[in-house]
Each structure stands twice: as structure tokens, then as C-alpha cells.
Amino acid sequence: MAFFNPEKFTSEAIAKLKTELSDKAIIAASGGVDSTVAAVLAAKAVKGNLLAIYVDTGYMRLGESEYVSSMLSTLGVKHKVVDASEKFYAGLKGVTDPEEKRKIIGELFIRVFEEEAKDYGGKFLVQGTIAPDWIESGGGLRDTIKSHHNVGGLPEDMEMELCEPIRELYKDEVRSLAEYLEVSVSQRQPFPGPGLAVRVMGEATPERTEVVRQACHIAENEMELAAKEGIMELPWQYFAVLIPVKTVGVQGDVRAYGNTIAVRAVHSYDAMTAQAVEIPVSYTHLTLPTICSV
């Protein structure tokens, strides 16, 4: 593999963006590493002609909207927060298949961005698409592993011109670029584009989504604490999933019947393959009682 030079890539990407973005542009900013890096590059290229749109789909992490807004302000990226949660909840009503969820969310994202682009006068849509996104989404001789909402979910009648400045980069290269650009989320763990909708197995209703939102927050915080205390190595990705099966348990001396939450942790060196991480018993002793209270 050729050595990745973030300084050289930044210079070339900004020059290319100055040529490509001949009019006002908006960027889909999720707060993740990929979209934030793309936003910083585009902002350096076209400055005030870029508006970052953060869409609150209702399937975001706990406190995410406030976090992303603060981060973009610190980075000097002009942005707008759009609450489209009701639109996304309605679009996923009755949907249980994760692949269908991804495609519906992809189309809804574009429709929201088209509305915002009309208000702003934007002609271009910048996205933080990276190599694993289009590889996993299939096409040609490649099998579809999973459709990424920013690839397989894009509608054919999209009105904006697409610009993807980091499309050829892999996750480790994006993180290296983020560190060079002094982006605070450079080592933030990956979060799926469709959000918690794909961490709710079955229908992602607002109520079920809130359960997994709280569970993810607890599981992630406790795992980060365990890593700091030397109980375990911090995994590459770690989160909770709501299983569509209820189970019987005992709380005190009383029968309990409630949701089933799974906690998953994996290591990955390329952001495309993963190996399960053995979670220490001491972590589960600390975390499970809190998750069970959700």
C-alpha cells in the first residue's frame, strides 16, 4: 500500500473542490469522522458558499445534535440543524428489513437535502462517502454486503450534483487526515449512516429506538470507562442492539418480562472486516444492571 500523505491530499482535494464546486453547496454532516473531514475540506475550498446540514432523523445518539452543532461551530463550518424525525419515523413505519431501512433512509435524506438546497440556493451535494461505502454497496461484479444510505440508497432522480472528495480513501486514511486537519472526532468510533434504525432489529418505532439509544449510551460509556481503568482494551466499535424478542427474568423476588438487549464489541483493522472482542465479566457486572433499568 502506498504511503498516505494527508498534507498532500489536503492540498490536492481543496484545489479540486475549488474547481468542482462552481456554485453554492450543501454537505450532509452527521458528526462522524468521514462527513466532518469532508465538511472541513469543502469549507476550506469554498468558505461561505458551503452550508453543512445536520439532519436529526430521530435515530441519532443521545445528545448528538447538540454535540455536532458545537463541534461544527468550533471548526468554523457554517451549519444548520434540521429536525426531520417525524418524517423518518413515518417513512420507516412497519419496515423491519435492515436493507429496506437503509434505502428508505437514503431517499429521505436526499429529499430533505433537496428542500434545504432550494432554500439555500445550493446546486451541489457534498458527501463524506469513503471506499468501503461503495465497495459494500455492490455493483458490477461486487456482491452487495449492505447498502450504504449515501450510495445504495440514493434516488435516481436526485436533483443535485454529487461531490465526494474522500471517496477513494479508507478508514485509516480518513482518520489520519482528520488528525492532520485537527478534527476532534478523528478517533470517534464509527456510527451507521442510518443510525439507530439498524440497531433496532424489527420495526424502529420511536419507543423502541429510545430504548436502544439509552442502552447504547450506557454500554459505550461503561466500555470507555473500563478501557481507561485497564479492565479491557477499547474495541474499534462497541454498541447495544435491541433484539425483537422479549424474555422472562427476575428482579428482586418479582417476575419480569421485558426487552432483550445485546452488547457487541469488535476489532477491525480495515473497517470492512471484524473480529469479535471478548467482553470481560467485570464489565458485564458493572453494566448490565444499569442497562436493565432502561
Predicted segment positions?
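ATP/NTP-dependent adenylation/nucleotidyl-transfer catalytic domains that generate, transfer
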Residues: 1-286, 293
